[in-house]
């Protein structure tokens, strides 16, 4: 009799879990569909002046099959140029070659949608609440509406969002594949938008700070023989995966060399802040 009741309870529990999974899948499908529609609407139909320059730079690179570090469209002869987003320029030119300006607009809609889905996926992992994740995603995309354009920054937003997702996964699971993903993101940013490459390291700092604080707490508690108590508002948990995160961050410093731009990833930001990117 007892076994029968136990089996009935287990079956009810399984049914409830199955229903919850179905609800979750349905909500995610609906949420993703709404996000794609909303993000596509945010993409501007009119293109910026930079788009024409981007197309020609990409064409120039493919025609010459090299990056000569000189501006081919300047009035001045042999004017140095750093090609800060050469890979993006090539990609946009290839899209333009296939679909013209309409193709670039469609690609902007697609990138915008990918950004929205990436934010939703990352928030779902962090917040653990589908509705809150959806609301945050819509709000974030609305705030970013002025930056949704056929420019390298749109792809960079996607990569930074994916970086946060991979860092969370690596910190929680210590699985190597997430570290490999972070290294690939470092290489992509160095080639797609070199100006913001140094900023990817800033995203590592909160994890390192959290880890250091938890170590200090543990040592302090051990020294005074006290038990660690959870904070009322902020709870810091020591995650061993952060050690691997630090190793990956150090490796990512070398990703700036995996580019045809030489040492530009290490110097471009400083030169930009100094107001000189031609030396």
Regions found by a protein language model. Give the residues of each.
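Short hydrophobic alpha-helices at membrane interfaces in multi-pass membrane enzymes
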Residues: 169-187, 243-244
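Short hydrophobic/aromatic helix or loop-helix immediately within or flanking a transmembrane segment
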Residues: 76-102, 106
